[in-house]
Amino acid sequence: MAEDEIWTEKYRPRRLEDVIGHQQITRRLISYVKSGNLPHLLFSGPPGVGKTACAVALARELYGETWHSNFIELNASDERGIDVVRNNIKNFARTAPLGEAKFKIIFLDEADALTSDAQSALRRTMERYAATCRFIISCNYSSKIIEPIQSRCAVYRFGPLNATDITTGITRIAKNEGLKIEKDGMDALIYVARGDMRRAINALQSAATIAKDITADVIYQTTSTAKPKEIEDMLKLALNGQFMDSRNKLDELLITYGLSGTDIIDQIYRSMFELGLDEDVLVALVDRIGEADFRLTEGASERIQIEALLAHFKMQGAARSK
């Protein structure tokens, strides 16, 4: 394989038993392979947790060498309208499977991006071509998939991968690539990944371009992520009434890491639970963080929203000390 190959593709599982995490789901999928048949499937869960990996591995095991001819992957976020159903999906679904396959598989990724009309057309297509085609529908939020589609599928919910799963996958890759990962480097990868194996692998590949000894500093540097302790220090300054010092720390983080407003808010949210705050204080802060996050999505000033958030931390700290 080429040295510059993207690692998320290079290390994509070829078999269902190689998929990391989700053992209960992979066991069910393996049983489909053994029976030679499967229903329509709905995979729901956040990005990078193995939905596509399971779909591709399922097709590989089910079809063998003809899997490319009997399996197609479409991304619904590229074309949200009804045309993707009328053209791409129907054109593939109406042709007969090759070899000894009983049916073909259409893997529709990010299907929650489809409009309601497109989903209704998809439901009709699923019914019409059920004899020769199976659908694997992947989405981040199953609530955005219309009920008539959900009721026609076996639903599998993929949760974020835990630290053990991330460690297992990253350790395999590091060994194969001749990398040494320090403990703090692995902790940093787990922190950066947030349960997303794809993000962890991409972070490792980026770090490997500048060092073979992977430390926390290398991970945070290459992923433009602030160290958790630096975020905690900024919040502690605000809680202790040192608003201007916390503001200066914010400046330092913005310059050093080039963080976006949403990145900082996400890290603030994750770090504040490590500060030993009372539940009432946490409730008030979570409410304020949610408000700031919403305003950023609406186009508000990042700087003003984050500084307002630090000001709220200061006020909560002052109230706590009374």
Curated annotation (Swiss-Prot):
Keywords: ATP-binding, DNA replication, Nucleotide-binding. It comes from the Archaea. SMART domains: AAA. ATP binds at G45, P46, P47, G48, V49, G50, K51, T52. Pfam families: AAA (PF00004), AAA_lid_RFC1 (PF25361), Rep_fac_C (PF08542). The keyword Nucleus does not apply. GO terms for cellular component: DNA replication factor C complex. GO terms for molecular function: ATP binding; ATP hydrolysis activity; DNA binding; DNA clamp loader activity. SUPFAM superfamilies: P-loop containing nucleoside triphosphate hydrolases, post-AAA+ oligomerization domain-like. The keyword NAD does not apply. Transmembrane segments: none annotated. GO terms for biological process: DNA repair; DNA-templated DNA replication. HAMAP family: RfcS. Part of the RFC clamp loader complex which loads the PCNA sliding clamp onto DNA. Heteromultimer composed of small subunits (RfcS) and large subunits (RfcL). Belongs to the activator 1 small subunits family. RfcS subfamily. This is Replication factor C small subunit. It comes from Methanocella arvoryzae (strain DSM 22066 / NBRC 105507 / MRE50). The gene is rfcS.
